[in-house]
């Protein structure tokens, strides 16, 4: 699932009333997930779908006109034949506590075959072979076929109330049936379970005195020369062939950081394997997150993934476990990553449940995990957590960036209707929550996190931030759901002043796009970043050509 899409534009009323009645929620969800009308944005000319070097057809996230040579689609009915109204049915769900220890089974995978079109594990997953004409059923003789019997039209249809499905048979509007669909709503109840994760020792409290953190002089925004889709990173038809190599058919995000010189980690969100189908999230072989590695320096022709962390042959494993229980912990989603010395860190959010309204979700907390074996296994720190009390936590979805003596933490609340806050911590104390200083009105203060001053005006989500050593400037990319765009800002210091947002990607051009995660080897002139598209539920590499201010 990663981050749920925001549709084409965010709904202000949805942001103000997240607890609206179920029917209103369903109506809003339907409205927000409908693509923008054609009148809002011209479609790009039709083009055949992309094909990788093995002849496999991939996905094109661009908003294109339909194939002019294809037969016209059947007309849509004026009204659906049935409207389903979900009815929550509470169900007591025992949840053993503490959490079970993670399964850290890992293998050292064999190198990929030299031939990129050769599947590394054909005994597990192989390219479907075309049907054998000799075994195909022969068409029957039309002369011997009989017409199917058609039931007589009574001129009426059953409904939930008198006349709700009536029709005179003379072309009158047929009203849809109303059906109430039971939907299990788990009510988690903690119960004692077997021994699980051992408690960790608490770090000593550290409170650093307040220090000045004034705004730096504003810089001019870069001029955007061009933005182009470089290529599909994951899924069927991608150059990486992640479906055949690692059972990654559908996934999202693609959060990147440098693990060591010459290597970049790529973290993905909710991932599904063989059996996933086009149309969004869900499917077999659900893993909350997976991790790949890349040494590809030439991004102009795409992002190559060399390998992934695996628990068995050709199977990318889940790194940060989750309980997968709605209203307790549905999933755990990476939000950023960074390295300090030999240790890797990953920020993540523990998702309590996804909302019926796109762009909204509830978290339990935002947390930090670390790895001392270059990302093969991870430990969730039990104290470096920012709890989401009453849904008001400001640092639930974070992007963390080491620079100088500090690690800077940019954060937003759960969902896509919050503002950006900022904190910092010394590198040696990154797992000690009490050592963090929050940027409050020009001061680095040992304050309560909710007092952090918003960095910029407006809503933001899915932050990605990097410090560009060449220009000595900060780059920040995020989804502005109110604007319906992935935007970029720059600043001379993490607290700003930040430039106005420069639009990189519009959801008019890339419907239901989200993300915007910067490749760490970008520059002030060449910005490479990943986006996700909801319906094809996979990751794409984008390239923005910039003209920075001189």
What are these regions (language model features)?
Residues 280-303, 360-376, 421-428, 488-494, ...:
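Beta-propeller blade signature
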Residues 5-18, 245-246, 495-522:
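Conserved blade-ending motifs and adjacent loop-strand segments that build the rim/top face
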Residues 1-41:
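Secretory targeting and sorting signals
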Residues 5, 38, 43-335, 339-340, ...:
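N-terminal regions that are enriched for targeting/export leaders
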Residues 5, 456-493:
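Loop/turn-rich, solvent-exposed surfaces of beta-rich toroidal or solenoidal domains
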Residues 516-550:
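Blade-level signature of beta-propeller repeat domains, shared across WD40, Kelch, NHL, RCC1
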Residues 257-259, 263-277, 333-359, 397-415, ...:
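Hydrophobic core segments of beta-strands in well-ordered, beta-rich domains
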Residues 220-243, 311-324, 373-391, 433-455, ...:
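Blade-edge beta-strand/turn elements of extracellular beta-propeller
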């Amino acid at each position: 699932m990663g981050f749920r899409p925001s549709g084409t534009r965010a709904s202000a009323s949805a942001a103000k009333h997240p607890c609206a009645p179920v029917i209103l929620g369903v109506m809003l969800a339907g409205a927000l997930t409908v693509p923008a009308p054609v009148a809002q944005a011209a479609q790009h000319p039709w083009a055949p779908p992309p094909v990788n070097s093995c002849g496999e057809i991939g996905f094109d996230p661009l908003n294109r006109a339909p194939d002019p040579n294809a037969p016209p689609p059947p007309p849509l009915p004026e009204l659906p034949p049935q409207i389903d109204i979900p009815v929550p049915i509470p169900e007591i769900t025992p949840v053993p506590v503490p959490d079970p220890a993670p399964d850290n089974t890992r293998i050292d995978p064999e190198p990929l075959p030299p031939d990129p079109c050769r599947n590394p594990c054909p005994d597990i997953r192989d390219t479907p072979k075309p049907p054998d004409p000799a075994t195909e059923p022969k068409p029957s003789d039309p002369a011997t076929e009989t017409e199917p019997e058609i039931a007589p039209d009574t001129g009426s249809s059953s409904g939930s109330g008198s006349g709700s499905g009536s029709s005179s048979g003379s072309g009158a509007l047929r009203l849809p049936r109303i059906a109430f669909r039971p939907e299990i709503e788990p009510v988690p109840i903690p119960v004692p379970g077997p021994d699980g994760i051992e408690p960790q020792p608490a770090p000593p409290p550290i409170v650093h005195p307040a220090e000045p953190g004034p705004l730096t002089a504003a810089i001019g925004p870069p001029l955007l020369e061009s933005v182009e889709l470089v290529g599909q990173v994951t899924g069927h038809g991608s150059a990486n062939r992640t479906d055949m190599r690692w059972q990654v058919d559908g996934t999202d995000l693609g959060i990147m950081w440098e693990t060591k010189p010459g290597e970049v980690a790529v973290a993905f969100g909710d991932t599904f394997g063989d059996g996933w189908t086009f149309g969004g999230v869900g499917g077999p072989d659900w893993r909350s997150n997976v991790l790949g590695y890349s040494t590809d320096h030439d991004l102009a022709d795409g992002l190559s993934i060399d390998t992934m962390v695996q628990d068995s042959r050709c199977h990318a494993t889940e790194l940060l476990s989750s309980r997968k229980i709605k209203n307790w912990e549905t999933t755990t989603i990476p939000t950023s990553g960074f390295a300090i010395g030999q240790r890797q860190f990953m920020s993540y959010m523990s998702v309590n449940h996804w909302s019926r309204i796109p762009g909204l979700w509830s978290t339990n907390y935002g947390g930090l995990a670390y790895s001392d074996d270059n990302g093969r296994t991870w430990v969730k720190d039990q104290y470096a957590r920012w709890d989401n009390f009453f849904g008001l936590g400001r640092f639930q979805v974070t992007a963390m960036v080491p620079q100088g003596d500090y690690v800077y933490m940019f954060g937003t609340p759960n969902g896509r209707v919050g503002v950006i806050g900022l904190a910092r911590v010394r590198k040696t104390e990154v797992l000690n929550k009490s050592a963090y200083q929050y940027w409050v009105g020009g001061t680095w203060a040992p304050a309560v996190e909710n007092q952090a001053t918003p960095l910029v005006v407006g809503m933001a989500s899915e932050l990605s931030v990097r410090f560009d050593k060449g220009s000595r400037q900060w780059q920040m990319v995020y989804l502005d759901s109110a604007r319906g765009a992935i935007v970029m800002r720059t600043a001379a210091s993490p607290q700003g002043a930040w430039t106005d947002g420069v639009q990189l990607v519009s959801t008019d051009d890339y419907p239901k796009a989200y993300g915007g995660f910067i490749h760490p080897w970008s520059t002030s002139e060449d910005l490479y970043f990943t986006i996700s598209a909801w319906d094809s539920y996979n990751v794409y590499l984008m390239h923005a050509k910039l003209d920075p201010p001189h």
